[in-house]
């Protein structure tokens, strides 16, 4: 295989890894936000919480689904990074 083809493939993999890393970071942020919102719900009055929910400021975060997404994205990112390492070895 030509080194140009490998370099192009490496670029595609880098873009994919970057996209997965960004999605993973957003999922982690959603999980952190859910924890903050859960804490706020306990600290604030019920009427305030209801008002904030109506406004969309407080959301009912499904943490189980977010945790599953984080697990999946982490595995996907590791797989892409493994392939990247293999391609980089071939380029060297």
Q: Where is each model-derived feature located?
A:
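Extended alpha-helical coiled-coil "stalk/arm" regions
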Residues: 21-59
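Long amphipathic alpha-helical coiled-coil segments
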Residues: 65-92
